Amino acid sequence: MDRKCVMIVDKNLPLGLIANTTAILGTALGKLEGEIVGTDVYDMKEHIHRGIVTISIPVFKGDEFLIRELLKQANYYPNEVLVIDFCDLAQSCRDYSEYIDKMKLASEASLKYFGICLYGTRTRI
């Protein structure tokens, strides 16, 4: 199946938080869709270069409204689009157990999304 991936990140974030957001989204994507990570490669002196993604992942600028709207639209197609989000609640936590506990008490409307990653069929992305 022909698949595509995009990330949309809030353009109003500081550069460091934009970089952090894309790193977290990419790591989660690699875990969930391991086949997109290529094999290790070697240069002419046999130095190893670890496998990187085998697909393009364009990163687009958006804002909180656009990210929320795209998230809403993508969630209509759960069998065709994998949605990964990163929000203020996650960024504020010291560890993953704190994230789990806080998320259980949060409403979706209370979250400020920093970025989303959409991976799915070309017709839906």
Where are these regions (language model features)?
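Positively charged, small/polar-rich N-terminal and surface patches that mediate targeting and assembly
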Residues: M1-I125
